[in-house]
Amino acid sequence: MTLSSDMSDVLAEETDIDVVGEEDEPRAEEEEEEDGELLMPRSPHCSSTKDPYKAAGSGGVGRSALVKPPYSYIALITMSILQSPKKRLTLSEICDFISSRFPYYREKFPAWQNSIRHNLSLNDCFVKIPREPGNPGKGNYWTLDPESADMFDNGSFLRRRKRFKRQQVPELVLREPGHFLPASAYGYGPYSCAYGIQIQPFHPHSALIAFQQQQQHQQQQARHQQQQARHQQQQARHQQQPPSLPSMAAPALMPPAAQDLSRTCTFYPHQLSPAALPPSLQSKSSSALARSTFSIESIIGGDLNPGPKAAGVPVISRALVTFSSSEAAAALGGNLQPGTVLTNH
């Protein structure tokens, strides 16, 4: 009995070991299945149902190796543009950078190329730069807007802080298609440390201020030139006037009383005394009175003695006395007798 009990204990231990070992039973079942497969002919339906599982198992290992990067398309485009020397790339160059850095996108190319194109066109943080006339190639360049430097949170491409909205720039700052942004426009402080870019930060409003100052300076120069041209024209007009008529050339420089006096002297050169005339006309009027005997008294037949008759002297129209005494004497042949009346023909 003792031996039988010992043998039973050993058998119990062996059975316990077999139950705990989970790998032995499937192997036995697989051996039985293989024996059954050897004995029984394999049907095409069974083989077709068993192959997809093997294929799925082999394909699952390949898919697990290609993990999609945790970056958005905007972050991928920003990475590619910042690593370029000129901070601008074409669509094909952006796709080449993403494919070379991330195996997932290398295997999925070109399925995601349209997504890159749409993100470039629809997001304001990307700016299109036309290709130079002398630079052959296909496609335009793309760069980053200088004001989108704080688009990502603390310079991390995993988190985007906010959606960038481009501000409306005045038309005065718009550049021609052949002109491009300066090199200082591509400096970004938050990203320069990660990519080894050491460029001075770009101030977007400096170009606008400089342009406005330049335009104001040009307008001031144009106004100054116009004033100089007007002044020269006025001087030329004064120089072209005949010097024999000082009363016509100098009224603007005389005081108002002298201007009225000069106009009166033009029509009544012999009614005024030489002392009341301007200095420029005193010598001329005195010489004319000395040469001619023509006077108002000779016309009206009065005498030279002042008296009560002087108060009744009629006023002669300005149209009758519009010529000098020398011209009147020449017209009458030098014969002018007292009592002769001149009429306007």
Curated annotation (Swiss-Prot):
Residues 11-37 have a biased composition (Acidic residues). Pfam families: Forkhead (PF00250). SMART domains: FH. Disulfide bonds: none annotated. Residues 1-59, 211-252 are annotated as: Disordered. InterPro entries: Fork_head_dom, FOX_domain-containing, TF_fork_head_CS_2, WH-like_DNA-bd_sf, WH_DNA-bd_sf. Residues 68-162 bind DNA. One of its GO terms (molecular function) is DNA-binding transcription factor activity, RNA polymerase II-specific. Keywords: Developmental protein, Differentiation, DNA-binding, Neurogenesis, Nucleus, Repressor, Transcription, Transcription regulation. One of its GO terms (cellular component) is nucleus. It is found in: Nucleus. The keyword Electron transport does not apply. Expressed in gastrula (stage 10) embryos in the dorsolateral mesoderm, where expression continues until mesoderm involution. In early neurula embryos (stage 12.5), expressed in the anterior neural plate in the prospective diencephalon and eye field, and in the anterior neural folds, with expression becoming stronger as neurulation proceeds. At stage 14, transiently expressed in two stripes lateral to the midline. Expressed in premigratory, but not migratory, cephalic neural crest cells. At stage 20, expressed in the paraxial mesoderm and in the optic vesicle. Residues 212-252 have a biased composition (Low complexity). GO terms for biological process: anatomical structure morphogenesis; cell differentiation; ectoderm development; forebrain development; mesoderm development; negative regulation of cell migration; negative regulation of DNA-templated transcription; negative regulation of transcription by RNA polymerase II. Transcriptional repressor that down-regulates bmp4 signaling in both mesoderm and ectoderm. Regulates mesoderm patterning by repressing ventral mesoderm genes and promoting the expression of dorsolateral genes. Can also neuralize ectodermal cells directly. Inhibits neural crest migration. The transcription factors foxd1 and foxg1 mutually repress each other to pattern the forebrain. This is Forkhead box protein D1. It comes from Xenopus laevis. The gene is foxd1.
